Amino acid sequence: MDEHYRVLALRVPSEQHPPPVATLMARRRVRVLQSILDDVVGRAALHTFDGTSGVVLLPGGPHQHAEQVTAATAQRFDTAVFVADGGEAARADLPAAGRAATELAELARALGRPAGSYRLDDLLLEYQLTRPGRARDRLAERIAPLSTRPHLLAALDAYLRHGTDRKTAAAEVHVHPNTFSYRMRRIAELTGLDPADPAGTRVLAAALTVVRAG
């Protein structure tokens, strides 16, 4: 083995297929990935990809190898693919680097981000919010009353993604602006956090991230 490797984690979304079909598709992706690695870096690359998720180790070399592998998987896989680029790691640090990259790829998928390549800098806040601890647990508790009210969660998600623009968010969830304003008031009543208040918005955004990440 080399002393240093570039660490990539791959994750594809779960799909509803009969088990035999899912197995065939997974095996095909493994073969495609091996072909990509052979073309880009040769036999020196290592991976644990099983057709759904796994880690790829690229030996020290041109940095564009990682970009080439990412682009090729996006083009040749039969589904969306999330790639987390964990950067270079020494051989002794590979297990930890692989776990961190795997968590990052899964986080991007769980949060509904577009398929593509992610680095830690792309999800710094979201990654930190999902670290275990009392604050994360409390954030989940604050938004728990919305868990049985998916229409309120959808309204909150749209509201936050559109920069608190109620008119645009209301159009996305297909309700009248007055109905949307009522939903915002219900969120405030149920959580004790007012979406119209900047401080409340920040906490609600953090809590929603925790819930989406599972």
Where are these regions (language model features)?
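Cytosolic nucleotide-utilizing catalytic cores of signal-transduction proteins
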Residues: 1-214
